[in-house]
């Protein structure tokens, strides 16, 4: 993979429902060269913070702008307008 990044977005769905959404988006993620490494929910349950990996930034943009992906995310309770790539990530370790 080419790059890793930290992202965030707001949501109205449960964390469990969001995990189901991620499973259903797997074909589109594969198509655009994306992989989620880690995700956590904010303490108040309103946001997700994730670490992802992508072959290219173009793939991330294509995934996030795909009309089918956008609709699936909206239907699941994701506030797509709040989506933010916070930072690129270099080295990291999961303990």
Put a short name on every predicted segment:
Residues 1-70, 76, 80-95:
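Short S/T/G/P-rich N-terminal loop/turn motif that feeds into the first structured element of a domain
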């Amino acid at each position: 993979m080419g790059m890793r990044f930290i992202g965030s977005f707001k949501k109205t769905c449960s964390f469990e429902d969001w995990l189901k959404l991620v499973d259903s988006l797997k074909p589109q993620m594969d198509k655009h060269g994306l992989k989620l490494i880690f995700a956590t929910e904010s303490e108040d349950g309103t946001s997700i913070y994730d670490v992802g990996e992508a072959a290219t930034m173009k793939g991330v943009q294509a995934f996030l702008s795909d009309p089918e992906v956008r609709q699936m995310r909206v239907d699941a309770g994701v506030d797509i307008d709040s989506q933010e790539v916070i930072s690129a990530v270099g080295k990291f370790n999961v303990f």
